[in-house]
Amino acid sequence: MPRALGATLVSTPLARRALRDRVASVRGARSIARAMSDAQDAFTSDVPPEGYTRADQVKRFAEAKAANRARVMDIDAVYDGSHVAGKRVLVTGANRGIGLALCRELAARGAVIVATCRSASEELKALKPAEIIEGVDVTSTACCDKMAKAVSAPLDVVINNAGYFYEPVERLTDGTMEFDEEMKMIDICAVGPLRVTNALYHAGKITKGAKIAMVTSQGGSVTWRTVQNPRGGDYGHHMSKAAANMGAKLLAQELKHEGIMVQVLHPGFNKTDMTAKYAKIWEIEGAVDASVGAKRVVHEIGLMTPEYNGMFINCEDGLQIPW
């Protein structure tokens, strides 16, 4: 386009308006970007927004310890598990770890337990749950459908707890990426809870008034990666938990119209076989026995109401975690 002609076009009212709109759009986009950056900084700072927990787990625990915060340091000081007495509660991944600890706590509180797993451990059998459903592979739709049909009656609470954690640290720069393991974690941790929930819903085992607890992890917070994973890595674990969180949020949005509540729960840092590779930081990050983690989860389920539907909660302190 000749220079003179271009100048003439820009000088017309329509062209000037278009140019102003474009400049305003660019400025608006930059303002939004700055606001998003500021929000990111707020959620990862030492003083997060009200109602949200702190990103730095070492500082979070040290602060709670110094202030002797009962919710964090002694769950029994605030714990009330009476709400599960007589309630039908299904737990996936019930044979070990936090799942087994949940079953122990639920049994102690008089819940009617429906325990699902691939293969029942002797410890689980000793609890004598009302129902043990074995052979449950959450990566199989057919297995989940079969499990749902085997559940004898509608449930009051579903705890989607089954998970998988590939222990070696993955780093692209080290050549240690394991893509098959990443897909396995995503299938079990993110798609698995959807298969279970879908099967139970369509079998009539999840109905109005039911609560669904999605046990995921703070590792699924995209916002917190700059603090908790400054060097990146551990792709499969974090991607699977972030995907699980998204699935749970979408479930919460859909099922609220059915009168069913869904909440995303980080159970806290628990001393289990799955976290054994982090044993050297258990103490400085406030890791607890699985029995304590189980109480934290049960306590939070008791606080679940429509007002808090779809929230991402840290069971250590009851505060929110940013997505």
Regions found by a protein language model. Give the residues of each.
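Non-catalytic terminal and boundary segments that flank Rossmann-like NAD(P)-dependent oxidoreductase
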Residues: M1-R88, P322-W323
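Catalytic loop of short-chain dehydrogenase/reductase
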Residues: Y164-I186, V191-R195, Y201-H257
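Conserved hydrophobic beta-strands of the Rossmann-like cofactor-binding core
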Residues: R88-V91, V158-I159
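C-terminal helical subdomain
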Residues: K65, H257, V264, T272, ...
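Conserved glycine-rich Rossmann-like NAD(P)H-binding loop of the short-chain dehydrogenase/reductase
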Residues: A107-L124
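Hydrophobic structural elements of the Rossmann-like NAD(P)H-binding subdomain
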Residues: I159, A213, V262-L265, T275
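N-terminal Rossmann NAD(P)H-binding glycine-rich loop of SDR-like oxidoreductase domains
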Residues: N95, G99-E105
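Conserved Rossmann-fold cofactor-binding substructure of NAD(P)-dependent oxidoreductases
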Residues: V136-P154
